[in-house]
Amino acid sequence: MRIIVVDNYEEMSKKAAAMMASQVILKPDSVLGLATGDTPIGMYREIINIYKNQKMDFSKVKTFNLDEYYGLNRGNPQSYYYYMMNNLFNYVNIDKNNINIPNGMADNIEVECKEYERKIDKAGGIDLQILGIGVNGHIGFNEPNISFESETHLVNLNEKTIESNSRFFSSKEEVPTKAISMGIKSIIHSKKIILLACGSAKSDAVSKAINGKITPNIPASILQLHRDVVVIIDKEAASKLNLK
């Protein structure tokens, strides 16, 4: 695990974008695992700038998003499909057929989850997975005490996650209580992982994930066992880390 501590959110975003750009430039048909939320927005903004300078080509890239709220249609501004279209996909030359995001309105969730795993396998697995980390140590929507053997599945969101995500909605009551998420096993099979975190609110989770014991109670702690993880965090998120 390589840990890069930067001064601020902007620097974190630029470093992450540079790594993603390198991945796509070196392997134009890369399979990218993508995250949503506040943390990666700056990275996507930087990626768009790199693309506009004609240094990236997304025409052969395939993407798989980590998760999607259950019960939100793709036109809902709070859906992660809407987020991805408006923060990245509408601004680059990606083939829309190569975009994969769980269907939060699927009639048969079990079939949807199995099909998502099948698509990842058919694509050859994920070359580079982008992750954020929740205040409770979750990655994707894999909440504490999730099995490390889990694949794509329907998740019951816990109170901390609902509370944290309520800032994106008009009220806490509007936050979906379930989501479809790639599982820990799905994530850990990625060839390379970049974990992003910014701000003091993430410092406990970052410290436990990196310095603590490997436990399902802190889902991100499993990343200690992965052979190629880069953690890019600002000073505040790193404030409780033991870097010796």
Swiss-Prot record:
<dbReference type="GO" id="GO:0004342">
    <property type="term" value="F:glucosamine-6-phosphate deaminase activity"/>
</dbReference>
<dbReference type="InterPro" id="IPR006148">
    <property type="entry name" value="Glc/Gal-6P_isomerase"/>
</dbReference>
<dbReference type="InterPro" id="IPR037171">
    <property type="entry name" value="NagB/RpiA_transferase-like"/>
</dbReference>
<keyword id="KW-0119">Carbohydrate metabolism</keyword>
<feature type="active site" description="For ring-opening step">
    <location>
        <position position="143"/>
    </location>
</feature>
<dbReference type="Pfam" id="PF01182">
    <property type="entry name" value="Glucosamine_iso"/>
</dbReference>
<dbReference type="GO" id="GO:0006043">
    <property type="term" value="P:glucosamine catabolic process"/>
</dbReference>
<comment type="similarity">
    <text>Belongs to the glucosamine/galactosamine-6-phosphate isomerase family. NagB subfamily.</text>
</comment>
<feature type="active site" description="For ring-opening step">
    <location>
        <position position="136"/>
    </location>
</feature>
<keyword id="KW-0378">Hydrolase</keyword>
<dbReference type="GO" id="GO:0005975">
    <property type="term" value="P:carbohydrate metabolic process"/>
</dbReference>
<dbReference type="InterPro" id="IPR018321">
    <property type="entry name" value="Glucosamine6P_isomerase_CS"/>
</dbReference>
<dbReference type="InterPro" id="IPR004547">
    <property type="entry name" value="Glucosamine6P_isomerase"/>
</dbReference>
<dbReference type="GO" id="GO:0019262">
    <property type="term" value="P:N-acetylneuraminate catabolic process"/>
</dbReference>
<dbReference type="GO" id="GO:0005737">
    <property type="term" value="C:cytoplasm"/>
</dbReference>
<dbReference type="GO" id="GO:0042802">
    <property type="term" value="F:identical protein binding"/>
</dbReference>
<comment type="function">
    <text>Catalyzes the reversible isomerization-deamination of glucosamine 6-phosphate (GlcN6P) to form fructose 6-phosphate (Fru6P) and ammonium ion.</text>
</comment>
<dbReference type="GO" id="GO:0006046">
    <property type="term" value="P:N-acetylglucosamine catabolic process"/>
</dbReference>
<feature type="active site" description="Proton acceptor; for ring-opening step">
    <location>
        <position position="138"/>
    </location>
</feature>
<protein>
    <recommendedName>
        <fullName>Glucosamine-6-phosphate deaminase</fullName>
        <ecNumber>3.5.99.6</ecNumber>
    </recommendedName>
</protein>
<comment type="pathway">
    <text>Amino-sugar metabolism; N-acetylneuraminate degradation; D-fructose 6-phosphate from N-acetylneuraminate: step 5/5.</text>
</comment>
<feature type="active site" description="Proton acceptor; for enolization step">
    <location>
        <position position="67"/>
    </location>
</feature>
